[in-house]
Amino acid sequence: GGILNQCIHNGFGLHTFKEELTGPEYAARYITQALERKIEYKLNTMVLSISKDKHITAVNREEGLIEIDARAIILTMGCRERSRGALNIPGYRPAGIYSAGTAQRLVNLEGFMPGREVVILGSGDIGLIMARRMTLEGAHVKCVAELLPYSGGLKRNIVQCLHDYDIPLLLSHTVVDIHGRERLEGVTLAEVGPDRKPVPGSEKYIPCDTLLLSVGLLPENELSEGAEVTLDRVTGGPAVNESLETNVPGIFACGNVLHVHDLVDYVSEEAARAGRAAAKFVRGGTPKSARVVKLTGRDGVRYTVPQTVRPAAMGESVVVRFRVANPYYGKYLSCYVDGERISHRKKQIMAPGEMESFTLTREALGESAKEVVFCVEEE
């Protein structure tokens, strides 16, 4: 399972294993570790529901309906792609319109070529990687169009996937019409203004037989909602504490179901953290902490994960991850504890497509801290 099976490009494992691996190679390292430890697993098994009291209902072909009462649950459902329906693009529904992840699966796993003349809408990492993959497979990628005035992907992917293959990146552009009834025949692109609405007169028709959509990822939290887990409205994932535990005791979350990551190494790091916390919970080692410190982002910082920390349970420090709202150049990233600035670091560049991190120490929280705020400042 998992998305790594279809990510046959390299770039994985630089942080974790200090070497460059493909997605399947990276996954195989952990599969080997799980087998060596004789960890029980169930394949081809669909979880239908999780209750607040940690009762799991699942189904598979061998055992039929399965009921499991767990003492701790770690949510690792990942995320799904935003579909064409969420974009409200006018036009018919011809063949040839795919999400970038679906096209990635068709090309890398199934061996099918979705099309020959390709336009990609959205510059998320999957869209950038598929621009390169389709070019390598012999297709002609006409352009990558991005609604925002900046790319949503990693700088590394923009250089390696677009610049190296001379694929144009059209910023502040979007698809305003889709042409073709049976098969896609072309799309109309238009420039958008600061209000993100098409500029009249800027439309241009581009003939193509395939449109790939890379327009955002949504954490897959339907099961979480069934367990009455509180979700963060910005990340779309559960609100968690320093142990990655949700508001439901014994239910933890990590990876893309928690918030969308750019590097799998960070997902693995988070997963190990959630695993340790779940094991500690099962053994009854989690202290009942009265004091909870709230973490928030403002003035350029969109969110923080975790959203709260309990100083008594956090150890010496905890890694806080977050994203900025816009690209910033030569600005300062600051951290305030109850209004007092404890950190003020100059960053040459900060971009929404690249996750930032900050190590928050228990010492910095002192004995009475109530709130930690992260923000971007001019000086």
Where are these regions (language model features)?
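Beta1-alpha1 glycine-rich phosphate/pyrophosphate-binding loop at the start
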Residues: 1-29, 105-108, 114-160, 344
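FAD-binding core/adjacent interface of flavoenzyme oxidoreductases
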Residues: 27-117, 191-201, 212, 239-240
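A Rossmann-like FAD-binding core segment of flavoenzymes
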Residues: 34-58, 68, 135-222, 316-349
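FAD-site-proximal beta/loop scaffold in flavoenzymes
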Residues: 75, 97-107, 210-261
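Residue-level detector of alpha-helix initiation sites
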Residues: 79-81, 124-126, 218, 258
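A conserved FAD-binding loop/helix module that cradles the flavin
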Residues: 254-304
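Surface beta-strand/loop "capping" patches
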Residues: 287-328
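Short, aromatic- and glycine-rich surface loops/edge beta-strands on solvent-exposed regions
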Residues: 320, 333-335, 360-379
